[in-house]
Curated annotation (Swiss-Prot):
This is Transcription factor Sp3. Interacts with HLTF; the interaction may be required for basal transcriptional activity of HLTF. Interacts with HDAC1; the interaction deacetylates SP3 and regulates its transcriptional activity. Interacts with HDAC2 (preferably the CK2-phosphorylated form); the interaction deacetylates SP3 and regulates its transcriptional activity. Ceramides can also regulate acetylation/deacetylation events through altering the interaction of HDAC with SP3. Interacts with MEIS2 isoform Meis2D and PBX1 isoform PBX1a. Belongs to the Sp1 C2H2-type zinc-finger protein family. It comes from Mus musculus (Mouse). A motif (9aaTAD) lies at residues 463-471. InterPro entries: Znf_C2H2_sf, Znf_C2H2_type. Its main location: nucleus. A zinc finger (C2H2-type) spans 623-647, 653-677, 683-705. There is a cross-link at residues 122, 553 (Glycyl lysine isopeptide (Lys-Gly) (interchain with G-Cter in SUMO)). GO terms for cellular component: cytosol; nucleus; PML body; transcription repressor complex. The keyword Phosphoprotein applies. Disulfide bonds: none annotated.
Amino acid sequence: MTAPEKPVKQEEMAALDVDGGGGGGGHGEYLQQQQQQQQQHGNGAAAAAAQDTQPSPLALLAATCSKIGPPSPGDDDEEAAVAAAAGVPAAAAGATGDLASAQLGGAPNRWEVLSATPTTIKDEAGNLVQIPGAATSSGQYVLPLQNLQNQQIFSVAPGSDSSNGTVSNVQYQVIPQIQSTDAQQVQIGFTGSSDNGGINQENSQIQIIPGSNQTLLASGTPPANIQNLIPQTGQVQVQGVAIGGSSFPGQTQVVANVPLGLPGNITFVPINSVDLDSLGLSGSSQTMTAGINADGHLINTGQAMDSSDNSERTGERVSPDVNETNADTDLFVPTSSSSQLPVTIDSTGILQQNTNSLTTTSGQVHSSDLQGNYIQSPVSEETQAQNIQVSTAQPVVQHLQLQDSQQPTSQAQIVQGITPQTIHGVQASGQNISQQALQNLQLQLNPGTFLIQAQTVTPSGQITWQTFQVQGVQNLQNLQIQNTAAQQITLTPVQTLTLGQVAAGGALTSTPVSLSTGQLPNLQTVTVNSIDSTGIQLHPGENADSPADIRIKEEEPDPEEWQLSGDSTLNTNDLTHLRVQVVDEEGDQQHQEGKRLRRVACTCPNCKEGGGRGTNLGKKKQHICHIPGCGKVYGKTSHLRAHLRWHSGERPFICNWMFCGKRFTRSDELQRHRRTHTGEKKFVCPECSKRFMRSDHLAKHIKTHQNKKVIHSSSTVLASVEAGRDDALITAGGTTLILANIQQGSVSGIGTVNTSATSNQDILTNTEIPLQLVTVSGNETME
C-alpha cells in the first residue's frame, strides 16, 4: 500500500527557511525533509533500499551550496517570483518526487529551480531548434554536460525575442569535446548586447563555469569564424579546470628572444641564435655583461665557466672605474680563454666581436701565465699617450695592424678606453711622448718572431700594406710609420699566406711570403724574403683572353697507326703487330715548312760514354738500359725513356675518367685503358666479324680460325713463274726480296687451293707467304 503524498504548503516552506538558521541552509533542509517524506510513504522494500544507499550528488551539491551565506530577505520573494515565472510551483516541484531531474541555478545571492523542459524556438529559416536545457530569468541557459556529446547546441543572445520564434544572426556552437564523469553543468552567458538585439562583438564575453568555480574567459566570436571560439586578437586566461578528477594547469608562459634594434646600428641578438660551435664556445656557458664608459663606448666581457673541471682556465672580469672627472679609465680585458668575447663599438657605431684574437689598444701582456691575467689600460688626457708592452718567453708570431680609426674594423676587435683623438704616440717604457706627426713604436721581445703589417689608407681610397719582420731581436726602436692620423693598434695571430702574382707578360713579381705559427704551434716559422722564377711552375687561370694563358692539349693518337713519340715505348707483344707506313719524305717536307723539330740526343749514360752514338751493331744505333741487371736494348730513344720510367716508377699518363685516376707509364697503355670505360671494340675479325678491344686478343682469335680451316682443291696451280723476255730479268746490285719455296699447285704449309672460287690474286693477298732475302751481285742475272 502506498500512502497518499502530503502536500507541503507555502507557510511550511517559509517556516523551514526561517528555522534553518541560514537562507541557503533552509533550501537544503527542505530538500532533505522532502526526501524523508518520500521515503516514509514508499513501500517497505524500497524504503529499506533507499536508506542503505547514499544521497544523490545533486542533494550533496545543494547541501554544500547552502553553506555559502544567507540570502537577503528580498531574495526569498524574488525566488518565489522566479519560480512562478518559470512555471514550476513549489508544491508541484515537491510533489514530483524525482530530485535527479531538478536543476538549481542562481546568482551569488539567489537560487533558482530550473525546469528541465527543453526550449523550442524557430530560426530565420523557419526550422525548429530545440535547446535541451533550462532558461534562467537573466537570459542564461544551463546545459548539462552529458547532453553535449555529439550534439549541436545553439544559444540565443539576450535581447532577442524568443516568444515569437526569432533568433539573432549570431549562433554559438558549444564545443562537443567537453566531457564529464559526474553531473557537472556548463553555464553560457552573455554580458553585453547591442540595440538591435544582436551580440556586441567587442564587449561580449562567453563564460563557461564548471563545478569547481574556476572560470575560462574567452572573447566574443566573429560571425565569419564560428568554429573558433577564441579569436587571435583576444586574451585567454586559463586558471585551471577540474573535470572528472583531472586537472589542467594554467597556461605556461612562453618567453621569446627577438633581436632588439638600438640607435647607432646596434642589435642585440638572442644567444640561442648564435652558432656556439663556430665561435669555439661548445660545452661552456657564458654570461656577458655590457657597460658604457664615460666616452660613450660599449665595454663587454664574459665570464666563461667551462663544463669540464679544468684548473688552467680561470674567469676574468672587466672592472671599469671612472673617476669624478671622467678622464682616467682602467679597463681589464680577458685574454686567457678564447670563449671570452670582447665586444666594442667603433666610431661608426658597428658592434665588433672576435673570438681568436688578442685585442687591446693599450695594456700589458705576459705570456708566461696568460690564465687569469689582465690587460690594464691607464688613460690620461694630460699625457695623451698609450703604453704598450709585450713580454713573451716563447717564440710567438703576432700581427700588428695599424689602420685608420675612421674606417670600420672587420678583422679584429678594438677595446676602446679613450677617444681616438688622444692617441698620438706608442712606446714600451712608459715615458711621456710629445705630440708629433710620427709615431714611435718600441717592442721589447725575448727571442721570437714577430710579423708587423701596417695598413694605411691614402686620400684616394687605396689601401697599402707595409710588412716588417722581427726575428730574434731584443729591441726594435723608432719604427716610424708615415701616417699622422690617429691609429688603433691590434695584436692578432697571423693566419694568412701571401703568394706571388704573375704579371700580364708572364713575369713573376717578388712578394714576401710568410708562413707563421699563429695558430699552428706544431709547425716552424718559415720566412721567404724573395722569390725568383727558378723552380716555380706557373699555372695560369682559365681565362682565354689572358696573354699568359697556357694550355696543353693531349692529342689522341690514330688508332690505326703507331705514333712513336718521346714518351712512348713498345713491348715485345706489340712488336709482333707493328705496321710501318712508308711515306714520301719530300712531300712531307713540303707540308712541314717552318716546323722542323730538332732531334735531341739520348741522355742515357751508355750513350754519353759512347760519344752520343750508343752501341753500334752494324749501321743500326742501339740504346741499352744502364740499370744493373737489366741490359735491354732499344732502337729508339723514346722507347728507352719509357723503359726508364718503368724502372723509376714514374707514371705521367693519368686517366681523366670520372672517379678513376689510374696512372700509366706509356700513352698506349692509357689509350688501351680508356677503351674499358668507353666500351670501344675497334679490332674486327675478318672471318666472323667479332670485335675486340685489344689487337693481341684479335690475333689469338684469328689463329683459332686458321687451325679449323681446311681448304680442299681438286687441281689448282697456285703460282707459276714463267720466263719472259730479257727485260723481265732482275739485274740489280744489293739485297732483293723475292718469293721462295713456291711449287706448282701448292704452297708449303698451306695445301691446295680451289681456284674456281677465288682468284690467284686473292689467294696471294690473304695468304701468309714466306719471304727469303737473296743477295745478288751487280753482274749476276737472275730469272
